[in-house]
Swiss-Prot record:
The modification N-acetylproline is found at P3. Its EC number is 4.1.1.39. Keywords: Acetylation, Calvin cycle, Carbon dioxide fixation, Chloroplast, Disulfide bond, Lyase, Magnesium, Metal-binding, Monooxygenase, Oxidoreductase, Photorespiration, Photosynthesis, Plastid. The active site is at K175 (proton acceptor), H294 (proton acceptor). This is Ribulose bisphosphate carboxylase large chain. The disulfide bond which can form in the large chain dimeric partners within the hexadecamer appears to be associated with oxidative stress and protein turnover. InterPro entries: RuBisCO, RuBisCo_large_chain_AS, RuBisCO_lsu_C, RuBisCO_lsu_C_sf, RuBisCO_lsu_fd_N, RuBisCO_lsu_N_sf, RuBisCO_lsuI. The basic functional RuBisCO is composed of a large chain homodimer in a 'head-to-tail' conformation. In form I RuBisCO this homodimer is arranged in a barrel-like tetramer with the small subunits forming a tetrameric 'cap' on each end of the 'barrel'. RuBisCO catalyzes two reactions: the carboxylation of D-ribulose 1,5-bisphosphate, the primary event in carbon dioxide fixation, as well as the oxidative fragmentation of the pentose substrate in the photorespiration process. Both reactions occur simultaneously and in competition at the same active site. One of its GO terms (biological process) is reductive pentose-phosphate cycle. The record marks K334 as: Transition state stabilizer. It is found in: Plastid, Chloroplast.
Length: 475
């Protein structure tokens, strides 16, 4: 070894591997208002102490690597490292812990969900010393929130654009989701909108296939909603799915939608990616388009209880990235969603300030500092008998979306839309009169069906349909 090399090695650097907890487990740390805080559900491998597991998460998602490196001495690790500052056992579990990690804000690029997730939910999820790892919640500090545009418009601006107040909005996903020609697709859109719905929707996998190219679909749907608007005197919308194989193609489709004069476009934000989604959200604000968001692929990420990422984190990320609507479960339909947990992330989407509430899965108080809210969309296996529960659960600021519950009506699409609109109006009126929709909901629907043959027919078709399975997602 040369004298020069010996001199370098003697200046405080000692090669080798040391426990993460010696550097990254800091229970004495006082979190800062500017820190991003994360709550991880950690399952260590047998023999790995929880302190080491929590410290490993902090290290591998910030500045650490598996061995000491001499370039650590060229920066201030105390300034930039993530810190596991608290650990708590999960009640009723032998080897499960909630690890709380604080990240200094300097680790993240401004206005980039992509960069934030690349660190916090990156390679650390494949770390061998952990049997499983799940990100349960994030606290996004106001200092970071202010670097994002957020939703293109938000709830109040959307209501003003549509001139619709005092009730949930009604939607319908056109079925079959694949296989219709553009003209027949447009016909279904027209029938639903003239029957009383506010919106119709492209399904998440309707993009530009051989049986229906995107441009043809856009033209026929624009014609349908213009005709329905003229007949009903109400503003109508159809979620034209702009999701595409490239960002350039996606923006081209959004530009064409704007030229057609439609009020809203749509994006699959997880399969399309956060960079694409944020770009589209910026375009929508600049050009007066509302943005509907579908969460296709979310269950791949969020349905396993001990590994992955909870949907409340994906919901927060969407509010930062930008969207005016997002699908968020129904509680009562065919898709996963426990009531209190669902309402927890619904509040995180809509409200300005949400208090910590572990009973609803909210690990941190979240201040959105006046960032516009996002309308939750309840969709999946719902029909007219669910209307009282949906009205009671979600209140006015939601979109209730009935696909099969509209198009499956025995008399056709327009009568299906009429049935849903009558049921909704009846439930809103009953609620406003002080009636208890939980106890009296079925009676409210029966009373309304006496005055609406369309609703009576829908009630008969779906009177026995239930989806009674225990939710996987529990606190």
């Amino acid at each position: 070894m040369s004298p020069k090399t010996e001199t370098k090695a003697s200046v405080g650097f000692q090669a080798g591997v040391k426990d993460y907890r010696l550097t990254y487990y800091t229970p004495e740390y006082q979190t800062k208002d500017t820190d991003i805080l994360a709550a991880f559900r950690v399952t260590p491998q047998p023999g790995v102490p929880p302190e080491e597991a929590g410290a490993a998460v902090a290290a591998e998602s910030s500045t650490g690597t598996w061995t000491t490196v001499w370039t650590d001495g060229l920066t201030s690790l105390d300034r930039y490292k993530g810190r596991c500052y608290d650990l708590e056992p999960v009640p009723g579990e032998d080897n499960l812990f909630i690890a709380y990690v604080a990240y200094p804000l300097d680790l993240f690029e401004v206005g980039s969900v992509t960069n934030m997730f690349t660190s916090i939910v990156g390679n650390v999820f494949g770390y061998k010393a952990l049997r499983a790892l799940r990100l349960e919640d994030l606290r996004i500090p106001p200092a970071y929130i202010k670097t994002f545009q957020g939703p293109p418009h938000g709830i109040q601006v959307e209501r003003d654009k549509l001139n619709k107040y005092g009730r949930p909005l009604l939607g319908c996903t056109i079925k079959p989701k694949l296989g219709l020609s553009a003209k027949n697709y447009g016909r279904a859109v027209y029938e639903c909108l003239r029957g009383g719905l506010d919106f119709t929707k492209d399904d998440e996998n309707v993009n530009s296939q051989p049986f229906m190219r995107w441009r043809d679909r856009f033209v026929f749907c624009a014609e349908a909603l213009n005709k329905a608007q003229a007949e009903t005197g109400e503003i109508k919308g159809h979620y034209l799915n702009a999701t595409a194989g490239t960002c350039e193609e996606m923006i081209k489709r959004a530009v064409f939608a704007r030229e057609l004069g439609v009020p809203i476009v749509m994006h699959d934000y997880l399969t399309g990616g956060f960079t694409a989604n944020t770009s589209l959200a910026h375009y929508c604000r600049d050009n007066g388009l509302l943005l509907h968001i579908h969460r296709a692929m979310h269950a791949v990420i969020d349905r396993q209880k001990n590994h992955g990422m909870h949907f409340r984190v994906l919901a927060k990320a969407l509010r930062l990235s930008g969207g005016d609507h997002i699908h968020g479960g129904t509680v009562v339909g065919k898709l996963e969603g426990e009531r209190e947990i669902t309402l927890g992330f619904v509040d995180l989407l809509r409200d300005d300030f949400v208090e910590k509430d572990r009973s609803r899965g909210i690990y941190f108080t979240q201040d959105w500092v006046s960032m516009p809210g996002v309308l939750p969309v309840a969709s999946g296996g719902i029909h007219v008998w669910h209307m009282p529960a949906l009205t009671e659960i979600f209140g006015d600021d939601a979109v209730l979306q009935f696909g099969g519950g509209t198009l499956g009506h025995p008399w056709g699409n327009a009568p299906g839309a009429v049935a849903n609109r009558v049921a909704l109006e009846a439930c809103v009126q009953a609620r406003n009169e002080g009636r208890d929709l939980v106890r009296e909901g079925n009676e409210v629907i029966r009373e309304a069906s006496k005055w609406s043959a369309e609703l009576a027919a829908a009630c008969e078709v779906w009177k026995e349909i239930k989806f009674e399975f225990a939710p996987v997602d529990t606190v």
